């Protein structure tokens, strides 16, 4: 079975979705699976090609801009490129960009990370989520969800989507490959570590309030690592 990994929607090598896709690829590589091709944005091509030299890696460059004509040109470019790549399964690690919604549904496996776009976005981005989340789930052959919570959220939000399409596969991390450098940490003693983007829906404020209640009862320091957001500087600090 030939799998086409569609990373064309990832334009930064250390973006969360890119990292997720590359971890999946690393798992296939470690288990000796060979029938894989990778389609990736020109901006991450070198990174992906160097990381996985054993897999054919095809570069695709999109026009910049968000006007309708640009989006249409990019979709046609993507469609023609994918059509010319032999594959049995198209693996898509994220709903956006939703080019795959107009691909053959019997070939597409989608990863749905959550439905937070329905709750945190406004305006055009919110309407895009409202339209493409259910369309993507309807058009794909199968969907991977990263937790049972997400699976139940999908079932409640879109009861018309068959639960047989939704397959829970948790995110994985190879712990043995993580470097152990405790002596270089700026924090001494015990600590609680939070790593994620500092967005409001991540509930960092609740974490801070909870730690504030416990800080005099436990010996731990709270360490927070993440990309700063306006809510962080406005409320937390």
Could you tell me what each predicted segment is?
Residues 1-237:
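Carbohydrate transferase catalytic cores enriched for Leloir-type hexosyltransferases
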């Amino acid at each position: 079975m030939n799998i086409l990994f569609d990373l064309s929607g990832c334009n930064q090598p250390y973006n969360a979705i890119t990292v997720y896709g590359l971890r999946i690829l690393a798992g296939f590589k470690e288990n000796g699976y060979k029938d894989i091709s990778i389609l990736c944005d020109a901006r991450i091509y070198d990174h992906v090609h160097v990381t996985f030299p054993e897999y054919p890696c095809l570069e695709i460059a999109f026009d910049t801009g968000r006007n309708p004509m640009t989006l249409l040109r990019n979709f046609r470019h993507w469609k023609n490129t994918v059509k010319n790549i032999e594959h049995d399964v198209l693996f898509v690690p994220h709903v956006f960009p939703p080019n795959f919604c107009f691909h053959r549904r019997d070939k597409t496996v989608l990863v749905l990370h959550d439905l937070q776009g329905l709750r945190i976005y406004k305006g055009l981005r919110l309407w895009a989520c409202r339209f493409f989340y259910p369309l993507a789930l309807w058009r794909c052959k199968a969907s991977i969800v990263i937790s049972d919570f997400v699976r139940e959220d999908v079932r409640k939000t879109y009861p018309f989507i068959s639960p047989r399409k939704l397959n829970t596969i948790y995110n994985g991390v190879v712990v043995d490959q993580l470097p152990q450098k405790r002596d270089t940490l700026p924090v001494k003693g015990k600590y609680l570590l939070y790593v994620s983007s500092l967005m409001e829906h991540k509930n960092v404020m609740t974490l801070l309030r909870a730690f504030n209640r416990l800080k005099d009862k436990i010996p731990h320091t709270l360490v927070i690592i993440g990309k700063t957001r306006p809510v962080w500087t406005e409320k937390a600090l």
